[in-house]
Amino acid sequence: QDKIDPKMVQYQDSPKDGNKCSTCVNFEAPSSCKIVAGKISPNGWCIAYAPMEDKKG
């Protein structure tokens, strides 16, 4: 499946409201994303941001 152009999801290289790629379920370290194309910063953000579940339970 083709990944989405970063412009389509309003990708930015900086966090938004404390949310960032490194805490998103779609982020794949060190610098890629399951759904957004291209090099992705761990400190970036886009409208597809989905926070990881807190594992502390």
Curated annotation (Swiss-Prot):
Belongs to the high-potential iron-sulfur protein (HiPIP) family. Coiled coil: none annotated. Gene3D superfamilies: High potential iron-sulphur protein. One of its GO terms (molecular function) is metal ion binding. InterPro entries: High_potential_FeS_prot, HIPIP_sf. Keywords: 4Fe-4S, Electron transport, Iron, Iron-sulfur, Metal-binding, Transport. Pfam families: HIPIP. Homodimer. It comes from Rhodopila globiformis. Transmembrane segments: none annotated. This is High-potential iron-sulfur protein. The keyword Methyltransferase does not apply. The keyword Mitochondrion does not apply. [4Fe-4S] cluster binds at C21, C24, C33, C46. PROSITE patterns: HIPIP (PS51373). Specific class of high-redox-potential 4Fe-4S ferredoxins. Functions in anaerobic electron transport in most purple and in some other photosynthetic bacteria and in at least one genus (Paracoccus) of halophilic, denitrifying bacteria.
